[in-house]
Design a protein with these regions (language model features):
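Bacterial Sec-dependent N-terminal signal peptides
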Residues: 1-27
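Predominantly soluble domains enriched in secretory-pathway, periplasmic, or organellar proteins
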Residues: 19-341
Length: 341
């Protein structure tokens, strides 16, 4: 996710030039407000609950729950060390967090935020996802190279699906029996038959490398894979690459708005790339919205079309710091950027 100022400027100018020459207008998205959370710790995926006015934030050893409109704290879920993501099962009134350093999932009550149970999973569960076709909770176990399948009715692991690779990331579903897994170390999409609980295909993403964030348009059957400075658009029926589009550096999250047909990539360099799905086979980069360094993950509130990107402030590096040194996060600077039109 390293990016020099010079390279960032070139990328931004080039994007502006291309948009101007082609007559494309800017997306209109901008940072409308910033929610500040004083507690320490890093961050990963946020989750906007479509069934309530709550925003859930993976934050070090806990999950912060905020009011989506005001940013006010409405709860905290503790003992989720290394938390990566949050998923919801509204029909059962339950939520699930993937706790990477604890190798488990926390089950909590959506209404109260109270913890109901912890479920052991594979090693370092990363993405956690409610799959609507099978009605199961699935975790991608980043260090274990497999998926844990949980029945939310019993809150028990009912299957483990081996996936080749040791860096499995985001999972998406076609809502018809197939799920798609980003394999970061293999630079491919792994296809799983969720009924048979078995891998059926491996689809290479080349020239895309290091895929992390993933989104899907279930209507047009298009997958959107956030790779190293590229968004790869893939046919979800056969793995054919439809398009490849330039995005900012350090993407770790992709969101899709099914109503506006917009794809958003959160880029750790400090931009959000906005791409329009004109049709199933035509895509255009229309904007690179300034955000903040470190804002690499994203979630969307599909009702309001609001986007949420967590980040923090960074301490300046010493002049003699070795190349590749990562800056430290300023303690207590955790925040969420709220982007609207």
């Amino acid at each position: 996710m390293k990016q020099s100022i010079t390279a960032l400027c070139i990328f931004s100018i080039a994007s502006w030039f291309c948009n101007t020459v082609s007559g494309q207008s800017a997306s209109g998205y901008h940072i409308a407000k910033t929610f500040h959370i004083a507690s320490p710790g890093g961050w990963d995926y946020p989750a906007a609950d479509a069934g309530s006015n709550k925003l859930y934030l993976s934050h070090g050893t806990q999950v912060n729950i905020l009011d989506k409109e005001t940013g006010d704290s409405v709860g905290v879920i503790s003992n989720t060390t290394g938390v990566h993501g949050i998923a919801f099962v509204h029909s059962l009134g339950k939520g699930y967090t993937s706790n990477g350093r604890l190798n488990n999932v926390t089950v909590f009550d959506l209404a109260s935020g109270n913890v109901l149970k912890q479920i052991a999973t594979g090693k370092n569960p990363d993405w956690v996802f409610y799959e609507p076709f099978s009605k199961k909770i699935i975790t991608s176990n980043h260090s274990g190279g497999d998926l844990s399948v949980i029945d939310p009715a019993s809150d028990e692991v009912v299957a483990t699906i081996p996936v080749i690779g040791n860096a499995v990331e985001t999972i998406m579903s076609d809502n018809a029996g197939k799920i798609f897994v980003s394999a970061e170390d293999k630079s491919e999409i792994v296809v799983v038959d969720i009924t048979k609980l078995a891998v059926t295909d491996h689809w290479p993403l080349s020239p895309g490398e290091g895929p992390t964030g993933l989104a899907i348009d279930v209507e047009t059957k298009r997958l959107f894979s956030g790779c190293d400075k590229l968004l790869i658009v893939m046919d979800a029926t056969n793995g054919k690459i439809i398009d490849k589009l330039p995005i900012g550096d350090g993407c770790d999250g992709v969101a899709f708005d099914p109503e506006t047909k917009m794809v958003f990539t959160a880029n750790g360099e400090g931009t959000m790339t906005v791409i329009k799905e004109v049709s199933a086979n035509e895509f255009k980069v229309i904007d690179n919205v300034p955000t903040k360094r470190g804002a690499r993950t994203i979630t969307i509130d599909e009702k309001t079309h609001t986007l949420f990107l967590p980040t923090g402030d960074y301490e300046p590096l010493p002049a003699n710091a070795p190349k590749g040194t990562r800056p430290k996060i300023v303690p207590g600077s955790f925040q969420v950027l709220v982007l609207k039109k």
